[in-house]
Amino acid sequence: MPHKVSLSRLKLTDFRNYAAAALALDGRHAVLTGDNGAGKTNLMEAVSLLSPGRGLRRAAYGDITRVGAAGGFSIFAALDGMEGDVEIGTGIETGEETTARKLRINGTTAKTADELTDHLRLLWLTPAMDGLFTGASSDRRRFLDRLVLSLDPAHGRRASDFERAMRSRNKLLDEGRFDPSWLAGIEEQMASLGIAMALARQEMLGLLTRLIEETRETSPFPSASLQLSGFMDGQFSRPSVDLEDDYAAMLAESRYRDAGAGRTLEGPHRADLIVHHREKAMEAERCSTGEQKALLVGLVLAHARLVGNLTGHAPILLLDEIAAHLDEGRRAALFDLIDGLGGQAFMTGTDRAMFSALGDKAQFFTVADGRVFE
């Protein structure tokens, strides 16, 4: 069983609808119940900001600060982390117009948010993700990249560096500045970063596919088959240096076409995650809404197991409205599966009775009017 990473304290100040809130946690799962709009998902969002990025809502930091607050917002958490006990504080200060937040770990200012991954890994599933299989390919790429990040924290930096290089190339092409040596330098950088991104995605899908196959007979959820499409399909068994050379050549050959289109038409930023329901031999986008939800839950929980297996530390799960639309039997099977992962899960719902199968495996909190209490 992997080491259980768990929060013991969570304090919020001027965060969303909370002027101040504090949770004392005992390491069990945390169930947050209350009416719609009470602020349950806001608490989950606060926990999600203990990972790199903008959290489960991907909101601008200025939008997170409580309306009417004099300053910014702050989040404090104490936890038994991957390297032992740790205290994490993050937020923005009064009047800041910023795309970055301040971050302190054990009282010391962190150089980058990537340092958070030394202490915990966070995975989440929210109702906003229910349309993942039928929505835009960019949503599926973002989903896949978060899966990769949980095992390869450098993936985020590679992706942002690739985007930066691609914007530079697009700007040169848009301005008609076809300097061969300048463009070649940028395209070589894009090729190195882009192929590294694609290979990291392929590796994640391979690991996840094997684990899904191994647990297929015991999972209460349908199994997914996964593949990437839209960028150098079927070529990733070749040496990476050859792939980089080919992609750089592809970019060089497509300069005038990309200039006309106003964007780069080939690359990992155009790839798509294709998911099939294995038992039905059907594309996920053609499955019923309920089948899509079950596929997604199974996929996220399989990934959580993979993270625990490979890192030795169970991730913290944020499962928003996870029990909605499941019958009693499937809810009980879901809770058994979550508990069997060995980590701490935060779950939300409107009805406490929906979580009765958890028994004493969970702490129960009521959320109402910007307050949280047991």
Swiss-Prot record:
Pfam families referenced in this protein's UniProt entry, alphabetically: SMC_N
Ranges in a coiled coil: none
Listed GO MF terms: ATP binding; ATP hydrolysis activity; single-stranded DNA binding
Subcellular location: Cytoplasm
Matches recorded under InterPro entries: AAA+_ATPase, DNA-binding_RecF, DNA-binding_RecF_CS, P-loop_NTPase, RecF/RecN/SMC_N, RecF_2
Superkingdom, natural source: Bacteria
UniProt KW keywords: ATP-binding, Cytoplasm, DNA damage, DNA repair, DNA replication, DNA-binding, Nucleotide-binding, SOS response
Any one of the GO CC terms: cytoplasm
SMART domains reported for this sequence: AAA
GO BP: any one term: double-strand break repair
UniProt main location, coarse: cytoplasm
The UniProt record lists the keyword DNA damage: yes
Disulfide bonds: none
Function as written in the Swiss-Prot or TrEMBL entry: The RecF protein is involved in DNA metabolism; it is required for DNA replication and normal SOS inducibility. RecF binds preferentially to single-stranded, linear DNA. It also seems to bind ATP.
Listed name of the protein: DNA replication and repair protein RecF
Lineage per the UniProt record: Bacteria, Pseudomonadati, Pseudomonadota, Alphaproteobacteria, Hyphomicrobiales
